Amino acid sequence: MALLERVGLANKADAFPSELSGGQQQRVAIARALAMQPKLMLFDEPTSALDPELVGEVLAVMRELAEDGMTMIVVTHEMEFAREVADTVVFMDAGVVVESGRPADVLGNPQHQRTKTFLTRLRSEHEHP
């Protein structure tokens, strides 16, 4: 129950998965993973299938995990989240590391054209959905 409290879902302890939103299901998955007391957590696009309103719920839990010192490897297109939470950002293309470094450097002043192109397209998509 403590782990459900940690992810803000103690009130849903008796709920079935079909009764939970996508964001709530993701937070339950995080609680289940935390039950194993991991030293490291892997997230592969944890918000990609969520409605935009629910993305914040999951990112808030992940932000709290980071603040508590959890080591996380996160594959994401949530660039602002990465900028705020990550110690290191790695940009990959076709399985190859193109650029890595501090978030401010990689996301704010990328050195490689492929990184620049990706970030420009991503910003354009967010501005003109």
Positions of predicted regions on the chain:
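ABC family nucleotide-binding domain
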Residues: M1-A94, V98-P103
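C-terminal boundary and immediately downstream tail of ABC-type ATPase nucleotide-binding domains
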Residues: A104-P129
